[in-house]
Amino acid sequence: MLPRKIPQSVNVILKAAGRMPAGLAARMAVLLSLAIAPISSFGAAKNPSVSPQVAGYKAVRVHYGPMNKMIMPVQINSHPANLLVDTGSNEIILDTDAAATFGVGPSPRGLRYVGFTEINGQLLPVAFMQSLTAGSMNFGSNPVVLRDSPRSGTGKAQVDGVLGLHILFRHKAVINCRTRLVFFKIDQSRRMNLSGVASSEKFTMIPIHREASGALTVPCSIHGQTGRLLVDTGAFVTTFPDTFFKSLGISFEPTRVSARFPTGTAQRVSAAQINDLKIGDFKVPPAKFGVAALPRFALRQGGTKISGILGMDTLYICHAIIDLDGMNLFLK
């Protein structure tokens, strides 16, 4: 039986930060026909200077920047930095120029780099950071991939790199997209029973599968056609491949929005109205979604064919909680 009262520790993680203002909700309904409505202007937590206390976990606040980026303020080798929380990436990745300002670069022992790794067909150098902290959470020393990439915005909106699944999985992160909080487990003996109490809060639980490539996917269906979506907090908008929609006979219209992929290629994003998208057993409210010629690396994760990318706009609107301990996605 479900408890009559939600345990305080779990309630802190489930509790919403407030309703989306009606005007902004209307803008989101047409986000692709005109422009992307910034999540950063949606309702914020009541007291953002205070992080909630949950036994066995440390909470780190994030904020939303331009293009729906979930940004976590961190310290890299004691230097302030901003990292994109990205469940679509396996690694910690830093912009090469930004890394140099943090003292992260070639090995001082004569070797140029610690090693190299291939990401989406690119061979990239691996360096080492001595320390990484976020709020009161200390992640210690970590390998970091260096990549030349365009910097995003200025000031607080600037992103210096990516915080990927390497860290998020190691610390069994629970990401609440709506309340702008990421909980990291520090006591491995504790485990929250999110599934039981989430149902009483009218969340729908969808199992997350980790593919051989490391990607996180969830089941979906459109027009009765089943498939899998890549759960990607680094994607600013939920997007489907144009070939998939053409096969379903779904029409789409051009927009002024474009998306840039890690390889540096940019694709124009079209929009399509979808009224019957289901993620697991959760029926997504009718909305316009992105349609683009997605790169091959995004459409195939190991032996799994990907039907689309579940991006931050839908995750936020549907109050998403991504539980990397229980491996479940909660939506409502």
What is each stretch, according to the model?
Residues M1-A22:
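N-terminal secretory signal peptides that target proteins for export/translocation
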Residues G18-M20, P38, G249:
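Short, flexible coil/linker elements and helix-boundary hinge sites characteristic
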